[in-house]
């Protein structure tokens, strides 16, 4: 029997080590059991990677993180090549251990008090007009990291007054009142929080999270700021059905959410949850039609869609697939 892992502060636990810390049993996927990727899931990498390396260098220079890299996003090459990135604040170690996610788990160090200024300067240097700020979960902080979000928003707006800011926030488990008090005082231009999947598979997919809690977070922010769009996203391919996805869409509309993203789940490693199915582009188109009929102002639905994928276009209501 292997010895239990004793977490050390500041150490990233990934793949097998991360999965060993999850209370929900997950069987390692053997290579022969992996679903073969269909043709529509194949990505063509850009021939020139200089822009990609430039963004990575800027991140390293300023001690910043992107969720694009930390979560192994399949769109990294496309987005970096177009000069866009989703910044991940509060470090690169998450206090949660969701078995679909490639972000490292562990005991994080204290937040970097200089991060808001470094982030704001980097964004100004890149001359960005739209930026997405997300974070790891920080259950170790009394406000779940809400004040750090607010500090980042304020610093960014001071250096880039005309910029649009979207926040993709964690669920602030057990800290909703405190977090919302802070965030409603310094609101973003778009408030995003992902449900990730359907309630039936939450125990397996999002251990430690609560479906109704997440809906309430979205609803309460919307009540405080009726004119600010709220947004949520789901991954498909984790054992849910299309009918269950559509029911979640109805729940989101009942809680005031107006923007939706649906994308295909991809297994980061064989230690993570396996892909149960690949949803076809036609099925994504059908779910988008359902979403628009329900009253969503925008729905980005497609195999490679992620919450922050072409987020500026999503906010303008432009077509994203």
UniProtKB/Swiss-Prot annotation:
Residue sites binding [4Fe-4S] cluster 2 per the record: 94, 98, 101
Q: Where in the cell is it found?
A: Cytoplasm
Q: How is the cofactor bound?
A: Binds 2 [4Fe-4S] clusters per subunit. One cluster is coordinated with 3 cysteines and an exchangeable S-adenosyl-L-methionine.
Q: Which reaction does it catalyse?
A: [[Fe-S] cluster scaffold protein carrying a second [4Fe-4S](2+) cluster] + N(6)-octanoyl-L-lysyl-[protein] + 2 oxidized [2Fe-2S]-[ferredoxin] + 2 S-adenosyl-L-methionine + 4 H(+) = [[Fe-S] cluster scaffold protein] + N(6)-[(R)-dihydrolipoyl]-L-lysyl-[protein] + 4 Fe(3+) + 2 hydrogen sulfide + 2 5'-deoxyadenosine + 2 L-methionine + 2 reduced [2Fe-2S]-[ferredoxin]
Spell out the PROSITE patterns in the cross-references. RADICAL_SAM
Enzyme class per UniProt: transferase
Assigned EC number: 2.8.1.8
Keywords attached to this entry:
4Fe-4S, Cytoplasm, Iron, Iron-sulfur, Metal-binding, S-adenosyl-L-methionine, Transferase
Domain Radical SAM core, chain residue ranges per copy: 80-297
Where are the bilayer-spanning segments? none
Q: Does the keyword RNA-binding apply?
A: no
Q: In which pathway does it act?
A: Protein modification; protein lipoylation via endogenous pathway; protein N(6)-(lipoyl)lysine from octanoyl-[acyl-carrier-protein]: step 2/2
One GO cellular component this record assigns the protein to is: cytoplasm
InterPro entries noted in UniProt: Aldolase_TIM, Elp3/MiaA/NifB-like_rSAM, LIAS_N, Lipoyl_synth, rSAM
Q: Where does [4Fe-4S] cluster 1 bind?
A: 68, 73, 79, 308
Q: Which cofactor does it need?
A: [4Fe-4S] cluster
Q: Which family does it belong to?
A: Belongs to the radical SAM superfamily. Lipoyl synthase family.
Q: Which HAMAP family match?
A: Lipoyl_synth
**Name of protein:** Lipoyl synthase
